[in-house]
């Protein structure tokens, strides 16, 4: 069709061209009662005091990027392996900011890093990398995240050359779900590519993670983004013109889908300049020999995602709900009945009025549990999440009960399902946004025998007890929630019945009793 596809394949496999150019979770002030306290995983990510070597030791180097390297590290006390992104401050290209004043330049550098930290803190989705800790010293920033041992999707593409439609659809559904979630929260990634998609392990495509939010930005519907950022193979033509919106991510996903199905990119070339010239024209082809066995539904989705005019291009949500993606969707089946029943049962029985206990159980569930411990519940969450936006709404929870009814499960035979779901949302929706978030689901649905080991309860207690006095104080709680102060009324509500010795503080034994009480009705 007039394209040298063989050269595209060879060039794509040997190059990773980089096109270079360069929550606030609390409320300060007059909180009247504990209902005003917003609880979410981002509140646990704070800049840690001390040297990173006191908490982690290096195992090996995983890779390197524009601003630093990524290390596999192991915690000295506790919960397995983590990936640590080490960002060397001096590696930033200070010239690209056209700033001569060193202080202003340093502020700009720090702004980019803090932007990535702020974004990662705010995200809670099964297909988006999770941030645990942040360290900083004179030379480096350290971002501690989940470790996914399966490596990059890029490596899988090189090894497998291309994927069948079922595997490609499974990969794209997860990527699009993550992108849909980002866009719903007014975040555009701007650097979606196979190198920024990680696999849980090399033998499974069921759990992937979107990483590297260094180029991400918040957007509004009224304002167009203007920075020229991204990677040449995957960059959208409107980004080259410096006038674009969140749909630049959809274009990048379209390029990835094209590559997954045929093994080479739609816009190839010997160098960045060649590639960008082709992207600017937006012309690509489905070579007959390479695409003759690919379904029309798959090709149609690619066409919609690679629509040149971004105003006419489909959204991530529309792509996620396309016929081709839905054709290969993994739905809840009979083998999932036990996990689904246990999850809904645990949510039904959860008593979430104690804010301190809510915060503790969310910390344990989101930060201390392992991938293996979360695996079955993560799978159920994604299957319940029919629209793929990374959150469970009332309709999706009701559908969970309806599925159990179809399996003749007694939990599905409840007469007042809508009332039950309303109560679940009231108790489990910790941040009161009207949805059950991924970490809320995991934390409340998981077996309390897994959650409430003495080690994990101690770690949760230490999160609050920042001065290591053995007591949780009013001031420490205010600090965790990002408040300037806590009223006596709110503190008394938080203390509740936990403060057995009436010393106006909570010790470890009182904390443990409180945690078991809030979940006494959970199935174990």
Curated annotation (Swiss-Prot):
Changing residue 155 to A: No effect on catalytic activity. A motif (J domain autoinhibitory motif) lies at residues 346-353. Transmembrane segments: none annotated. Changing residue 64 to A: Loss of phosphorylation. No effect on catalytic activity. Its EC number is 2.7.11.1. The modification Phosphoserine is found at residues 17, 28, 34, 64, 118, 217, 220, 335. Changing residue 350 to A: Severe loss of catalytic activity. Its main location: membrane. Changing residue 366 to A: Slight decrease in catalytic activity. Ca(2+) 2 binds at residues 429, 431, 433, 435, 440. Myristoylated. Myristoylation, palmitoylation and the basic cluster motif are required for the localization to the parasitophorous vacuole membrane. Palmitoylated. Palmitoylation increases in merozoites in response to low level of extracellular K(+) in the host blood. Myristoylation, palmitoylation and the basic cluster motif are required for the localization to the parasitophorous vacuole membrane. The active site is at 191 (proton acceptor). Ca(2+) 3 binds at residues 465, 467, 469, 471, 476. GO terms for biological process: intracellular signal transduction; peptidyl-serine phosphorylation; peptidyl-threonine phosphorylation; positive regulation of regulated secretory pathway; protein autophosphorylation; protein phosphorylation. Activated by calcium. Upon calcium binding to the EF-hand domains, the C-terminus of the junction domain (J domain) undergoes a conformational change which results in the dissociation of the pseudo-substrate inhibitory motif from the catalytic domain. This, in turn may facilitate the autophosphorylation of the activation loop at Thr-231, which leads to the kinase activation. May be negatively regulated by PKA-mediated phosphorylation. Inhibited by purfalcamine. Residues 1-34 are annotated as: Disordered. It is an enzyme of class 2 (transferase). It catalyses: L-seryl-[protein] + ATP = O-phospho-L-seryl-[protein] + ADP + H(+); L-threonyl-[protein] + ATP = O-phospho-L-threonyl-[protein] + ADP + H(+). Its cofactor is Mg(2+). Residues 346-364 are annotated as: J domain. Changing residue 27 to A: Severe loss of ATP binding. Partial loss of catalytic activity. It is a lipid-anchor. Ca(2+) 1 binds at residues 385, 387, 389, 391, 396. Residues 372-407, 416-451, 452-487, 488-521 form the EF-hand domain. Calcium-dependent protein kinase which acts as a sensor and effector of intracellular Ca(2+) levels probably in part downstream of cGMP-activated PKG kinase. By phosphorylating various proteins, required for microneme secretion and thus merozoite egress from and invasion of host erythrocytes. During gametogenesis, essential for the development of both male and female gametes. Phosphorylates SERA5 p50 which enhances SERA5 p50 protease activity; however, SERA5 p50 protease activity has been shown in other studies to be controversial. This is Calcium-dependent protein kinase 1.
């Amino acid at each position: 069709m007039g394209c040298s596809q063989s050269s595209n394949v060879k060039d794509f496999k040997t190059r990773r061209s980089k096109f270079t150019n360069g929550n606030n979770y609390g409320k300060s002030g007059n909180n009247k009662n504990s209902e005003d306290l917003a609880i979410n995983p981002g509140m646990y990510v704070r800049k840690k005091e001390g040297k990173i070597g006191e908490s982690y030791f290096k195992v090996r180097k995983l890779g390197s990027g524009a601003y630093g390297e990524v290390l596999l590290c192991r915690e000295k006390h506790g919960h397995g392996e983590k990936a640590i992104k080490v960002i060397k401050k001096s590696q930033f290209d200070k010239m690209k900011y056209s700033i001569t004043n060193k202080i202003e330049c340093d502020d700009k550098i720090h702004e980019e890093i803090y932007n990535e930290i702020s974004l990662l803190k705010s995200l809670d989705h099964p297909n988006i990398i999770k941030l645990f800790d942040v360290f900083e010293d004179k030379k480096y920033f350290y971002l501690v995240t989940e470790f996914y041992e399966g490596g990059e999707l890029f490596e899988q593409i090189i090894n497998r050359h291309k994927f069948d439609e079922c595997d490609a659809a499974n990969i794209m559904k997860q990527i699009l779900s993550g992108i849909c979630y980002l866009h719903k929260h007014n975040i555009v990634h701007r650097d979606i590519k196979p190198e920024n998609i990680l696999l849980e392990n090399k033998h499974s495509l069921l759990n992937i993670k979107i990483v590297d939010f260094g180029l991400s930005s918040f957007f509004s519907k009224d304002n167009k983004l203007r920075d020229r950022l991204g990677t040449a193979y995957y960059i959208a033509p409107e980004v080259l013109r410096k006038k674009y919106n969140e749909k630049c991510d959809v274009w990048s996903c379209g390029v990835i889908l094209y590559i997954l199905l045929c093994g080479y990119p739609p816009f190839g070339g010997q160098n960045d300049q060649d590639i960008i010239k082709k992207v600017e024209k937006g012309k690509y082809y489905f070579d007959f020999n390479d695409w003759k066995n690919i379904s029309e539904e798959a090709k149609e989705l690619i066409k919609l995602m690679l629509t040149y005019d971004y105003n006419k291009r489909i959204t991530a949500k529309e792509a996620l709900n396309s016929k081709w993606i839905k054709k290969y969707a993994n739905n809840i089946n009979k083998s999932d009945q036990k996990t689904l029943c246990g999850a809904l049962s645990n949510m039904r029985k959860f008593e979430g009025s104690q804010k301190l206990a809510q915060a503790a159980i969310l910390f344990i569930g989101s930060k201390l549990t392992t991938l293996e411990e979360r695996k079955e519940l993560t799978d159920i969450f994604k299957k319940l999440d029919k629209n793929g936006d990374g959150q469970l709404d009332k309709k999706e929870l009701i559908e969970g009960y309806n599925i159990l009814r179809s399996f003749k499960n007694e939990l599905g035979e409840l007469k007042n399902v809508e009332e039950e779901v309303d109560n679940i949302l009231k108790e489990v929706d910790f941040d009161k946004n009207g949805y059950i978030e991924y970490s809320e689901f995991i934390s409340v649905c998981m077996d309390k025998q897994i959650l409430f080991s003495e080690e994990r309860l101690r770690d949760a207690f230490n999160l609050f007890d920042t001065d290591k006095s053995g007591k949780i104080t009013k001031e420490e709680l205010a600090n965790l929630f990002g408040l300037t102060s806590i009223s006596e009324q709110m503190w008394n509500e938080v203390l509740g019945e936990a403060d057995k010795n009436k010393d106006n503080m909570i010790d470890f034994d009182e904390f443990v009793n409180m945690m078991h009480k809030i979940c006494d009705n959970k199935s174990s």
